[in-house]
Amino acid sequence: KVAVALLIALVAVVAFAFLQPHLPGQVDPNLCEVDPVTGIQYRNIAPGEQGFIWGSNAIGQDLWARIWAGARTSLTIAFFVALIEAVVGITVGVLWGYVRQLDFFFTELYNICDNIPSTIILILISYVASPSIQTLILGMSLTGWIAMARFIRNQILIIRDRDYNIASRCIGTPTSRIVVRNLLPYLVSVIMLRMALTIPAAIGSEVFITYIGLGLSVEIPSLGNLINDGRKVMMQAGLRYQLLYPTIILSFVTIAFYLIGNAFSDAADPKNHLQ
């Protein structure tokens, strides 16, 4: 029940994040607003004042608009990373587990990639390439598929030589058909679980790489940028809302994805359905 409630809330938050700019009365997240009477730029307006729902930052930008724009950016990065890791991981995992001739090659490739810290790769790519959404997606996806591929490979090894698969090979069924019809349907729950856990990990990586100054530029709202900006003013009691609101959104999204992923894993595990 908790997982279902979290799932409903998470879907609502994600849907609102992407629908928010199309709702009436929304403003540009990069617009620096000024007082219409005095013409002076707004600075650090408290939440609920001057029409700012969640307040403004030091240059008059609406935090309500920026936080939802940041959530869209971070979620977009996370969704693409999860999709790329799933496609590459499934492809490599199936070949690794089903085609015996490729086992040595993929095992050595796995050993090489697995011994290179993914954080180091992400930092190096972000440092060498210009900061952009595409750069972050590339850096996170470059080795992120390894865990998915290994998991798929292990599952393939378990079901590869079952009677119905051996029979299919004996009657000349194409390998591609065996994989699609006999193997992948058993892996749907595993794939969904891995993707659900990849999303919060990717969001966390975006926040981390932006926090150390190698992430997206300040012109692109992201949860990492917003938390980094809030950190700079957190010692001023009246400005802590600039850190509080993006942190709440980040915490909810990452924890919800993690708990839902674990609940989905438990529900899909046959051991939990034994009488």
PLM regions and their residue ranges:
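Gly/Trp-centered helix-boundary motif
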Residues: 1-86, 90, 94, 101, ...
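Amphipathic cytosolic juxtamembrane alpha-helices at the membrane-cytosol interface
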Residues: 61-76, 80, 100-103, 107, ...
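Hydrophobic alpha-helical segments of membrane proteins
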Residues: 79, 83, 87, 91, ...
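Alpha-helical transmembrane segments
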Residues: 145, 149, 202, 253-257
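Generic hydrophobic transmembrane alpha-helix motif, especially the helices
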Residues: 53, 84, 89, 94-98, ...
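Hydrophobic residues within alpha-helical transmembrane segments
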Residues: 8, 68, 80-84, 109, ...
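Transmembrane alpha-helix boundary and packing residues in multipass membrane permease domains
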Residues: 10, 94, 123-127, 136, ...
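Glycine-rich helix-loop "coupling/hinge" segments at transmembrane-helix boundaries
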Residues: 126-130, 156, 204-249
